[in-house]
Swiss-Prot record:
Binds 1 zinc ion. It catalyses: Release of an N-terminal octapeptide as second stage of processing of some proteins imported into the mitochondrion. Residues 1-27 form a transit peptide. The lineage of its organism: Eukaryota, Fungi, Dikarya, Ascomycota, Pezizomycotina. This is Mitochondrial intermediate peptidase. It comes from Sclerotinia sclerotiorum (strain ATCC 18683 / 1980 / Ss-1). It holds the Pfam family Peptidase_M3.
């Protein structure tokens, strides 16, 4: 089965983490901290210092940016070069030309593969199918990004049409049994496989497994049923996510009963002394955290944890359809189908990991519960014994508020994090670890979708230009607030045969050279002696700038700094994972491995040696006192065990719902959820009558892989401690440590068994096999610092 890259359907760990911590205010507490170690000498290229200065200025100085971006202005004498320098995309009509040109190339490849009959022809099947995948992704991924991001409605519509055309063709290919059979012949011929590169073997295996998942080997009637079920799931899933509703939409109280809640918030929802609170949203969450009246908190808690009957029905129907699909595809469960190509490999292995992690985490949670109980017993207004479900957030909030009152340091943190200095810091860190830096590059007319977008070229000390990064980081009306990393074009080797094909296109005047035509005008490099299309990445954030004529730069909160580091972790994986084949480039790896580089980057964001590279006051140039960060980190981790317990139980719930249980006529999603809370939790269990699982929208996107968030947190923490020495003695900025991470993990993209990557980077052969024992070992490592 051929797949487009597209944004991952699961929520990245930063987003999940923000949901967990959104109920907490900004607060600080004292903790032990260490002074930053001296930073190693910088042996960078002569142009690096100029790039470093310019990098800060293009983000922090509006005047400098206005001068720098003059070249991007379009005029009669300077026609547009096309979005991302894709020569087809100079106007809306170009999307159709781009799609049709790519479609014709794809059809020629399909014909070639289907007609293969000699050993020499079969030898090219894996690489041909990889190029076929690349041609689909070139249109689908880029068009999907443009239709969601571009401000011009005509361009959005054109991108949507191009997307639909290529997506439809991709679905046709996924039911073309001849492609699967030809791949099977090639893989079954030892003489052919012996001549393949390691990447070709991996890609062939990936494609074969994907074809199997699409039930391509089933009889026609069953295959048609598979397609019908897949279509139903694709309709029920979004319907469940988009239209989930609570059993009660509002609760009404006398405003006098809401003592403790922000009076401004209460007034916003009050009419004639009656306060009407929506049961979904910020007001209800704030009430549970702050209202002193326990009975009011209980009523609001019950309503916020109870989905409507129709919502729960949709959820259970989705789970049933997925279970039927798995059975039809000859799998025991949907989890077994989904996990076969992941690091976990099986539901049993995920269970091993989660149970080991729960065991490690349980004693931490018990300590947190004891602290909450102690605080509750000191409260004269407490009206019930023990810790109730509606007490947890309230007393957590009270404890954090009591600590916050002793220090206000973190309120001033943002003054040390102008966006330009943070981008400088990322470039300096990547230079020290991996020998690559971010170099501002003037854009051509029509190259970007908004005048705020900055282009950065990624320059390697050894390989020259290795990637293009488009940064759309500032807030504007109508823009999505969600941070994201998009791969617009993957790394891939361009063959001599492709250049010969491209020579016909270069003759039409659209392209100057065959090399340019082979990659639609987008960035390429021949530094390694082989022509490659370069990774082209878009980074989206929503950082607020000062309005009017203020010269103050965009200042980031520490959480926003962590978010930017996280997203750049995805980017560096794409940048360093420059493989010869598209299917395994960069972030195209196992779902439960994809977040590792980005979660690891969050550790760097909090390290004193890394922060000393860039964190300085935007006005005084004073270096950031690290104790301010240490206090912020201590507060963020104050109830980390409880957060982790919730994630463990939700991961177990995801597995249980995607087992064969939904096929039983007595399947009851509420009973399963409450039973998992009872069995594995130290926190209070949801009371009877609630059914929160109806709000668990990630069940559709994750589909058996919700554990990935926890799994990659554990892996990242272990690598941080073992490879980078937890930042001690300058380990976070040491080139040798960065080289080990690059050589064992990042450079492979998805072209190597991730368990081998893990065993190699940790020098721990115990986990190389990736079996249930390995999963249990990983679980025992825990997530707590």
């Amino acid at each position: 089965m051929l797949k487009a890259v597209m944004p991952r359907p699961w929520v990245c760990s930063r987003c999940v983490k923000r949901q967990i911590q959104s109920s907490r205010g900004l607060a600080t507490a004292s903790t032990q901290y260490r002074e930053p170690r001296p930073v190693p000498t910088d042996h960078s290229a002569p142009g690096a210092k100029h790039d470093d200065r310019t990098l800060r200025q293009i983000f922090d100085s509006p005047d400098f940016w206005a001068d720098f971006s003059q070249s991007s202005k379009q005029s009669y004498y300077r026609p547009g070069v096309g979005l991302f320098q894709n020569r087809y995309l100079v106007n809306p009509q170009g999307f159709e030309v781009f799609a049709n040109t790519s479609l014709r190339k794809a059809q020629r490849i399909v014909d070639k593969v289907l007609k293969a009959s000699t050993v020499e022809e079969y030898r090219h099947v894996a690489r041909d199918l990889d190029r076929l995948s690349d041609l689909l992704c070139r249109v689908i991924d880029l068009s999907d990004f443009v239709r969601a991001t571009h401000p011009n409605a005509a361009i959005q519509a054109a991108a949507s049409r191009a997307y639909a055309k290529m997506f439809e063709y991709m679905n046709i290919l996924n039911t073309t049994t001849g492609l699967d059979k030809q791949l099977e012949v090639a893989m079954g011929t030892p003489e052919i496989v012996a001549g393949w590169t390691e990447e070709e073997v991996v890609v062939a295996d990936i494609l074969k497994k994907d074809f199997a998942k699409s039930a391509i080997d089933l009889p026609r009637a069953q295959r048609e049923k598979f397609v019908a079920l897949s279509q139903e799931i694709s309709e029920i899933g979004p319907d469940f996510v988009d239209y989930m509703t609570p059993a009660k939409s509002y609760l009404t109280f006398e405003s006098s009963k809401l003592k403790g809640m922000d009076p401004v918030l209460v007034r916003e929802h009050t009419t004639w002394g009656q306060t009407k609170i929506p049961t979904i949203g910020g007001a209800a969450a704030a009430a549970i955290r702050t209202v002193q009246n326990e009975e009011v908190r209980r009523e609001i808690f019950m309503a916020t944890r109870t989905a409507s009957r129709n919502t729960v029905h949709k959820l259970e129907e989705l789970m049933r359809k997925r279970a039927e699909l798995a059975k039809l595809s000859r799998y025991e469960s949907y989890s077994q189908l989904a996990l076969g190509d992941k690091m976990a490999k099986s539901p049993a292995s995920v269970t091993q990991f989660l149970e080991a992690l729960a065991k490690d985490n349980n004693k931490i949670v018990q300590g947190e519960v004891s602290e909450l109980l102690k605080f509750k017993f000191s409260n004269p207004n407490a009206s019930s014994p023990g810790l109730q479900p509606w007490d947890k957030d309230y007393y957590m909030s009270r404890i954090l508020a009591s600590v916050r009152s002793h220090s206000r340091n973190s309120d001033f943190l943002s003054a040390y994090f102008s966006l330009g200095t943070v981008m400088q810091g990322l470039s300096r860190l990547f230079t020290r670890l991996y020998g690559v830096r971010l170099a501002p590059h003037e854009t051509m007319p029509g190259e970007t979708w908004n005048s705020d977008v900055r282009r950065l070229d990624v320059i390697s000390e050894t390989d020259g230009h290795v990637a293009v990064l488009y940064c759309d980081l500032f807030s504007r009306p109508g823009k999505s607030p969600n941070p994201a990393h998009f791969t617009l074009r993957c790394s891939r080797e361009i063959t001599t045969a492709e250049l010969e094909e491209a020579s016909m296109l270069s003759q039409n005047g659209l392209f100057k050279t065959d090399e340019e035509a082979a990659n639609d005008g987008m960035a390429t490099s021949k530094s390694s002696g082989v022509l490659k299309q370069l990774p082209t990445i878009a980074l989206i954030c929503d950082f607020v700038t000062m309005s009017g004529k203020s010269s103050r730069p965009a200042l980031l909160s520490f959480n926003e700094v962590q978010t930017l580091f996280h997203e750049m972790g995805h980017a560096i994986h794409s940048i360093l994972g420059r493989t010869s084949l598209q299917n395994v480039s960069g972030t195209r790896c196992a779902t439960d491995f994809a977040e590792l580089p980005s979660v690891l980057m969050e550790h760097f964001a909090a390290d004193p040696s890394v922060l000393s590279l860039f964190a300085r006051h935007y006005e005084t140039d004073q270096q950031l006192p690290y104790e301010m960060v240490a206090e912020k980190l201590a507060l963020d981790k104050r109830f980390e065990g409880s957060d982790t317990e919730n994630q463990i139980i939700l991961s177990m719930l995801d597995l249980a719902y995607h087992s064969d249980l939904p096929l039983s006529p007595t399947f009851n999603s509420t009973e399963i959820y409450h039973s998992l809370q009872q069995k594995h939790g130290a926190l209070p269990v949801d009371p009877p009558g609630t059914c929160w699982q109806g709000f668990f929208g990630h069940l559709f996107g994750y589909g058996s892989t919700y554990y990935s968030y926890l799994f990659d947190r554990v892996l990242a923490r272990r690598i941080w401690q073992v490879v980078f020495q937890g930042g001690e003695a300058g380990g976070s900025v040491h080139r040798g440590n960065g080289e080990k991470m690059k050589e064992e993990v990042l450079k492979w993209g998805g072209g190597r068994d991730p368990w081998k990557c893990l065993a190699g980077v940790l020098d721990d052969g115990r986990v190389e096999n990736g079996d249930e024992k390995a999963m249990a070992i990983v679980g025992s490592w825990g997530v707590k610092e």
